Amino acid sequence: MLTQEIIIVILAAGKGTRMKSNHPKVLHFLGGKTILEHVIETAQSIKPKKIILVYSDQKKPVLSNIYNIPIQWIIQKKPQGTGHAILLAIKKISDNTEILVLYGDVPFISPVSIKKLQKSKKQSKISLLTAKVKNPNGYGRILRKKGKVISIIEDQDASNEQKNIKEIYSGIFIAQSKDLTRWLKKIDKKNEKQEFYATDIIALAHLEGSFIKTIEPLNYEEILGINNKLQLSNLEKIFQKKQINKLLINGVTIKDPSHFIFRGTLQHGQNVEIDTGVILENNVILGDDVKIGPGCIIRNSSIDSNTNIQAYTIIENSKIGKGCIIGPFAHLRSNTLLDRNVHIGNFVETKDTFIKNESKVKHLSYLGNSEIGSKVNIGAGSITCNYDGANKFKTIIGDNVLVGSNTQLIAPIKIAKNTTIAAGTTVTKDVNTPCLVYNTKEQKYKKNWMRSKKIIKKN
């Protein structure tokens, strides 16, 4: 673990114009989290003395209140480069302490590589995270003389000869705040972008006779940055592959890994099976022997053991008990709670509904703002009419109730246990004792009636 005396500065002030979006670049999503969220979580795992985040928008990003450790937000009102952004952060630091600089658009940097970087700092004034790559386009190049780092040249300022250099700079480094302040105050804006480049401090450190150490990350993917939607898409693929490989190694059966999308966190038991085309988002919990059929979307929900989620079912913000059968083509919306051995069938939609043990809603029904007892059977086409155009009301159905097909339950309403409701009934009043509930509907006949005939148009 790194020392707690380190201060982490995250640079997130870039406008991200190449994303061609109204949203800040670092607030685009990668693997179910914002790009910036990945970086902050890594920083948080190191347990630093402080995290300082430099941003450009007048309004703080929505992440400002998420994390337990406080984040100090510093605005860079005008885009004057990374050197200027780091100097703004250091001005808020009173003592001479170790500074780690991370970037808000480099999401895969690992705590292990940061630990290596900090360890190497003990041997130098400044330690850089670098890598040797086949295609260095877009990155600053490491310039060496007799093996020693003497400076960094940005891609847009590099000569043709310098552009052939394969060793690149990630932008991530560690140095003492006192040294950084001295170097940053000496840099200028004589470059293509007319900005203060943080990379210029390397040449200054060299001129002072400082030894500059370089460390490579565990893998090249850790220093990949995001500047456009293509790069975001490529990193999403990398993220998905890593997450899926972890699940496979940990015993989850994924029948078609190339068509499984996982954006968030997954806790799982043994013998979990996931079919093709499944999407899991946010925080998902799958118990032992859970089976997820093809095309399902499960978002921020928990599913207990031995439950079978059949094809093309959507489950959102819900909790499913043991031994349930859901789907196919069911939609369990927010705050659906199912007890044990509940069956939700084809084209059933639920919301804000609690269904107790062994109840069945097998066809073409809607249950909203409802509490359903145990061993209840809801017939096809039954609807809880919970909304009057302004307010929503609750339907409460007791144990062992049989609701016939095509029934409308006009909320607020309560149905006593052991009641039977005949098919086609509209229930408008509470049923307080067990009985048969039905509407009298006279069946009529019209004799000598004939169907209409098609009119044949003449040309």
Curated annotation (Swiss-Prot):
Residue sites binding acetyl-CoA per the record: A380, N386, Y387, S405, A423
PROSITE patterns: HEXAPEP_TRANSFERASES
CDD domains for this protein: GT2_GlmU_N_bac, LbH_GlmU_C
Subcellular location: Cytoplasm
Pfam family name, one: Hexapep
Binding site for UDP-N-acetyl-alpha-D-glucosamine: 11-14, 25, 76, 81-82, 103-105, 140, 154, 227, 333, 351, 366, 377
NCBIfam families membership: glmU
Record protein name field: Bifunctional protein GlmU
Gene (name only): glmU
